[in-house]
Amino acid sequence: MTYFMFLLLMALVVGLVAVASNPTPYFAALGLVVAAGVGCGVLVGHGGSFLSLVLFLIYLGGMLVVFAYAALAAEPFPEAWGSRSVLGYVLVYLLGVGLVAGIFWGGWYEGSWVVVDGLKEFSVLRGDISGVAVMYSSGGGMLVICAWVLLLTLLVVLELTRGLSRGALRAV
């Protein structure tokens, strides 16, 4: 399990570097999918299965807007991963991550990252699942507002990427 978590954390770093280097919107969207999926996998590995599921669904809603932008912002000659500028950014980011990891390497194993009920022998309910009732009772209105904001953002991105003459909403 330790090797699997190490692999997930390294994939998370690679996904975040792919988003930060941002060669074209296509590849940045792919890096965002990798980072979101692997980040939720790290949460599942540490026992937060419900939190991971909710965050991944929120990421999918946000990535819908990113995919709409990436599909409509087509470039005739997109920069790929092999171009010099993108490789320069990737190397700088990876060296920065390596430098920061080298500085803070000692002492990372002194703490423990455990879910609230992870130390109990027999637990009927998990700590992250008991938050479902609170999320839907107290936060139900906020969930509806967030859904409408994501829809509005999607429509704004679709309208802005088509220009003034032919809007995406007029074509329907």
Curated annotation (Swiss-Prot):
GO terms for cellular component: mitochondrial membrane. It is a multi-pass membrane protein. Its EC number is 7.1.1.2. InterPro entries: ComplexI_Subunit6, NADH_UbQ/plastoQ_OxRdtase_su6. The keyword Electron transport applies. It catalyses: a ubiquinone + NADH + 5 H(+)(in) = a ubiquinol + NAD(+) + 4 H(+)(out). One of its GO terms (molecular function) is NADH dehydrogenase (ubiquinone) activity. The keyword NAD applies. Core subunit of the mitochondrial membrane respiratory chain NADH dehydrogenase (Complex I) that is believed to belong to the minimal assembly required for catalysis. Complex I functions in the transfer of electrons from NADH to the respiratory chain. The immediate electron acceptor for the enzyme is believed to be ubiquinone. PANTHER family: NADH UBIQUINONE OXIDOREDUCTASE SUBUNIT ND6 (PTHR11435), NADH-UBIQUINONE OXIDOREDUCTASE CHAIN 6 (PTHR11435:SF1). This is NADH-ubiquinone oxidoreductase chain 6. It comes from Cyprinus carpio. The gene is MT-ND6.
